[in-house]
């Protein structure tokens, strides 16, 4: 069932962490969870042009700490920090507690699954061919270090009357392997023909249980490798297999005697 289950939920507490990190009593849990959902929807709408990959919400001691991972942190901060101050005020009004906002930059947006899905959905809304958008995203991800990528689009692709699903994959995407670092993202493209769903899986290598990358063993140096045997042509003739005449084990044929002259 590795093909069906959510890749992030499958790896929680193994190699991935939760995006909401707080504890609450049973009576408060539902309200705080709904609050988190409203905050995420607000940030998705407010920072639509800032290329936001993910949002982490923490609640330490009647406060809230929100970390926004963005490929364009300058758009979030704004000139002289004006935009982030207004964003902080809106979040405090939504959550009812003091809010501290951190901005983290995404170094390689071409390998972030959520940003890839959002980019493809924006291109589909601009009437770009879905195959071209998918293949271009795959090429960029593989060029910048991804070990594998899979993209799936579902809906009325190119405006056809019957909805279908198409997917492309390049490299390895081991969905059953728990230690595999699989980044997963989804998005929706609202076109004139209807909604098209995009799913993206990006394989970035294996991880240890603590979330760190495994230490790769160095390859043996050239001088430490076992010396190769000399080519067959460099060995002396007649001593190839310990037998005379090469490796066939037959002695060379003797020359035939010359015929006697006639009349003798």
Curated annotation (Swiss-Prot):
PROSITE patterns: KH_TYPE_2, RIBOSOMAL_S3. InterPro entries: KH_dom, KH_dom-like_a/b, KH_dom_type_2, KH_sf_prok-type, Ribosomal_S3_C_sf, Ribosomal_uS3_bac-typ, Ribosomal_uS3_C, Ribosomal_uS3_CS. Residues 214-264 are annotated as: Disordered. One of its GO terms (molecular function) is rRNA binding. Residues 219-240 have a biased composition (Basic and acidic residues). Pfam families: KH_2, Ribosomal_S3_C. GO terms for cellular component: cytosolic small ribosomal subunit. Residues 39-107 form the KH type-2 domain. The keyword Aminoacyl-tRNA synthetase does not apply. One of its GO terms (biological process) is translation. Keywords: Ribonucleoprotein, Ribosomal protein, RNA-binding, rRNA-binding. Belongs to the universal ribosomal protein uS3 family. Binds the lower part of the 30S subunit head. Binds mRNA in the 70S ribosome, positioning it for translation. Part of the 30S ribosomal subunit. Forms a tight complex with proteins S10 and S14. This is Small ribosomal subunit protein uS3. The lineage of its organism: Bacteria, Pseudomonadati, Pseudomonadota, Betaproteobacteria, Burkholderiales.
């Amino acid at each position: 069932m590795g093909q069906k289950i959510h890749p992030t939920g499958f790896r929680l507490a193994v190699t991935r962490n939760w995006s909401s990190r707080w504890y609450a009593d049973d009576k408060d849990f539902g309200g705080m969870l709904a609050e988190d959902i409203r905050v995420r929807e607000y940030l998705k709408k407010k920072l639509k042009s800032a290329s936001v990959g993910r949002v982490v919400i923490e609640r330490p001691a009647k406060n809230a700490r929100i970390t926004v991972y963005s490929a364009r942190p300058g758009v979030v901060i704004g000139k002289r920090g004006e935009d982030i101050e207004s964003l902080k005020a809106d979040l405090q009004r939504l959550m009812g507690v003091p809010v501290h906002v951190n901005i983290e930059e995404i170094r390689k947006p071409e390998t972030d699954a959520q940003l890839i899905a959002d980019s493809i959905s924006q291109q589909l809304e601009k009437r770009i061919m879905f195959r071209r958008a998918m293949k271009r995203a795959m090429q960029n991800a593989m060029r910048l270090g991804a070990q594998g990528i899979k993209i799936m689009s579902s809906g009325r692709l190119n405006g056809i009357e019957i909805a279908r699903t198409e997917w492309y994959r390049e490299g390895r995407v081991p969905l059953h392997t728990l230690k595999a670092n699989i980044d997963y993202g989804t998005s929706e493209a609202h076109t004139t023909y209807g909604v098209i769903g995009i799913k993206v899986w990006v394989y970035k290598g294996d991880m240890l249980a603590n979330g760190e990358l495994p230490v790769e063993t160095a390859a043996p140096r050239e001088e430490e490798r076992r010396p190769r045997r000399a080519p067959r042509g460099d060995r002396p003739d007649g001593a190839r297999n310990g037998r005379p005449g090469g490796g066939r084990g037959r002695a060379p044929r003797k020359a035939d005697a010359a015929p006697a002259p006639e009349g003798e």
